[in-house]
Design a protein with these regions (language model features):
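Detector for the mature cores of small, proteolytically processed
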Residues: 1-21, 25-26, 30, 34-99
């Protein structure tokens, strides 16, 4: 399935994933084996982030933060760090195998 990768330097590009594990590779560093977190947006799509990104001092992702604020998904003082995936097709994502 195709999803949108939003990087901390402001770039957006389509990437293909075939498993949840592949999706996690884009946002979480396996060196730390971090869990991924889902932030559900008002239209039903969601952003996949590194749950421990702030602990790792990852860079601010201004675009993802703006999207989350516009959808009232995070507190006004909160922010998102690290590269994220924007997933539009929740049903297709849910059907992905884990590995």
């Amino acid at each position: 399935m195709n999803v949108t990768l939003i990087t901390t330097d402001g770039r957006k590009r389509k990437v293909s994933i075939n498993t949840f594990d592949e999706a996690r590779q884009f946002v979480c560093n396996y060196q730390y084996n971090s869990p991924a977190e889902i932030i559900v947006l008002m239209d039903g799509s969601f952003i996949l982030i590194d749950e421990e990104g702030k602990l790792k001092n990852l860079d601010l992702n201004r675009i993802a933060t703006d999207i989350a604020h516009e959808n009232n998904c995070i507190y006004p003082s909160d922010y998102i760090v690290g590269d994220v995936l924007l997933v539009d097709d929740v049903d297709e994502f849910d059907s992905l195998p884990f590995e």
